[in-house]
Amino acid sequence: MANADTIAAIATPSGAGGIGIVRVSGPRTRAIAQALTGKIARTRKVYFCPFRDGDEAILDRGLALFFPAPASFTGEDVLELHAHGSPVVLNWLLRRVCELGARRARPGEFSERAFLNGKLDLAQAEAVADLIAAGSEAAARAALRSLEGDFSESVRALFEALTHLRAWLEAALDFPEEDFAHEEQDFLSAPQLADGLARLNAQLAELLAATRRGVRLRDGLHVVIVGRPNVGKSSLLNALAHSERAIVTEIAGTTRDVLRETVNLDGIVLTLADTAGLRESRDVVEAEGMRRAHAELGRADVAILVTDSAHEQTDSILLGSAPPGAARILVHNKIDRSGESAHRILNKSGEIHIWLSARTGAGLDLLREELKRLAGHGEATQGAFSARARHVQALQDVAAHLRAAQEHLQQRTGELAAEELRQAQQVLGEITGRFSSDDLLGRIFSTFCIGK
């Protein structure tokens, strides 16, 4: 896909540094390179040269690298200017490049052009942003695997399997007199369809599980700590974060707002949220804090309900705002006062109970191990790839279409089954961008940084 305009942006983070990069891509790149450097852009050449303004005054000296189309990141002619990392110098260069016919790039526009020109599929393009934003080594390795195409290859394999199944079903519908639909056999009950659907569902289940692990690696877990006032919620946050992040006092109601802290737990990123104590209150500020606590709980992946083990109360009702799919851990704190030992139990209703002391640290390892387990730590993360919530939703939609197709086959409505398979394939193609709306592309690439 040829773009009529040339784009440019500063590709390195804002602020001063040893080196800064201005990136240019598009049809005017060669002309811009020659006007700015006085050099004719050649392949496999790195030039150390002055960068000049319109009056031939030197803006800086640095390296100019030219990547001709299609052998570049975007698939277009690309120029990189490596200059001193002063924001002033880099803005001089960017302004000069725009004077020569480029325009400032939108966020993610370089990656968008790489996608549109077939250099990356959509999942790989998203992996570029995920690698830049990776908050742990495990997340970075997973993003690299997605960038190398591991996730896309799994999606393509499923897409091809769907293609074969659709081809068989639609051919049988269009040409019922052929060999694959014997007169004595209802082709909708043929083993090819049943076996094909079974294999598809197995592939899909495996990919969906791996994708959920990928989302956890990318996003981490949102862990919300709730409970009545003065049960040790802030102490628990501080203990998990290994810092005095929250104010701890004997005065109930100290925490009025949601306090968040990011923790790296053996490669799993946890966003911990300490919330206001939940109780009846006429204090307007405290009541607002409790409203925010319930709102935060409504977005939780894991809800931790903290109680005082020395004065146990039935507080499970406080978890009422947690989403249905959120994991729930009941922490019985202050065992240093109640005299109980640190331990963990899983009761008959499936609730996880952990007895610990946030003050002394006794039992904290039990909670950390439980959080790691919930995050999928050790679940084949060695070969995990990065993924996003939209990928999980797409695969869930594919599963729904496959279930509907199976029901239509059982009801002998082959045309409707074929339509469900077509829709499943359409949704699957949206993951890699084989089928994508302009709105979807706009939403994805607008979240990228400028210059990428």
Question: Model-found features: residue ranges?
Answer:
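Generic enzyme active-site microenvironment
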Residues: 272, 306, 331
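Inter-motif core of Ras-like GTPase G domains
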Residues: 286-310
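Conserved beta-strand segments of alpha/beta enzyme cores
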Residues: 103, 269-271, 352
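Conserved G/P- and acidic residue-centered "switch" motifs that form tight phosphate/ATP-binding loops
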Residues: 118, 230, 274
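Short, acidic/hydrophobic/Gly-rich beta-strand patch recurrent on exposed beta strands
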Residues: 23, 237, 274
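Switch I (G2) and immediately adjacent beta-strands of P-loop GTPase domains
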Residues: 48-68, 253-281, 299-302
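A glycine-rich (often HGG/GG-containing) alpha/beta subdomain
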Residues: 1-141, 145, 149, 329-330
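C-terminal-of-GTPase-core extension/linker across diverse P-loop GTPases
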Residues: 1-14, 137-264, 281, 299, ...
